[in-house]
């Protein structure tokens, strides 16, 4: 795997039996003890992920809030200090450049967390729209490591090695300068699994020590390292979208059912606003739906969705769900076929298998919302 980047945790994967793959140009573990075991560990106990491949950027300055609002579809004005917001960044046509988290530290200080596969593109896009805004934009990706600790026991375990009461960090809130095993970190109650949990940002040189400290703290409870395989099945069951599967620059947030994060009534303009207003007024022509495969098989990304011999869309993500123990998926289909209960076929290896549209909220989240 020459020419691939590594995270500050690259040296620990093999200690835990990690199987390494190329993901977004990084050497990362796809699994440790097996993705099914890891999936259930996060659903029932707690699991630790290396997500240091994610990108981070700081935006500061007098116009930081205005600038971020210009880039994002969600309402940045509602964000208070030490809060986190999920949002989309769109192009002029309303297509998704990326989905990301915006952290507001204090005043005019914002921290953006962006997808690894879009890191360079996003930073270039953000810097390219600076214009006359009085802001400073700094790509801080290489100076930050990120761990995600997720699962129903995550708080109980992490509490053993931190100097704050984690119950004070509510869902989509953050706290800076938290001492985790004596190391200064940013901790937020956020995640990508559908479970309660935390994302921990630290200095790269502290990452290995924190990795071992967290797993040691959770040894009795059964905490385990988790690879990319389970990360994807976990987010999929919770109907959390993946850039490149459910979204790209030709797909809008409205088409994938994420209109809640597109605030068309905000006073300020944002990139793609006019196109999204027009699309909402005219009505979407395609829609993201959940489906269950009724025949035996497993749906995969890119498989055709067929109705009465006509291709009406494609599968964006599909798995045999480890939690629900059935073959389910997400598909982007023509709007008239998106109603729950609609039957259609999925073309799996030259065979058309029966499927039915279902609610795409496959798994109810257990995050602490209050």
UniProtKB/Swiss-Prot annotation:
Gene Ontology CC terms: cytosol; glycine cleavage complex
Top enzyme class: transferase
Record GO terms (molecular function): aminomethyltransferase activity; transaminase activity
Record EC number: 2.1.2.10
GO biological process terms, semicolon-separated: glycine decarboxylation via glycine cleavage system
Stretches that traverse the bilayer: none
Keyword vocabulary terms for this entry: Aminotransferase, Transferase
Catalytic activities: N(6)-[(R)-S(8)-aminomethyldihydrolipoyl]-L-lysyl-[protein] + (6S)-5,6,7,8-tetrahydrofolate = N(6)-[(R)-dihydrolipoyl]-L-lysyl-[protein] + (6R)-5,10-methylene-5,6,7,8-tetrahydrofolate + NH4(+)
Pfam families reported in the protein's UniProt record: GCV_T, GCV_T_C
Statement: the UniProt record of this protein carries the keyword Phosphoprotein: no
Signal peptide: none
Keyword DNA damage tagged: no
Domain of life assignment: Bacteria
Family matches, as InterPro entries: GCS_T, GCS_T_bac, GCST_C, GCV_T_N, GcvT/YgfZ/DmdA, GcvT/YgfZ_C, TrmE/GcvT_dom1
Family in the record: Belongs to the GcvT family.
SUBUNIT field: The glycine cleavage system is composed of four proteins: P, T, L and H.
Cited HAMAP family: GcvT
Role, per record: The glycine cleavage system catalyzes the degradation of glycine.
Name of the protein described by the UniProt record: Aminomethyltransferase
Organism of provenance: Clostridium botulinum (strain Langeland / NCTC 10281 / Type F)
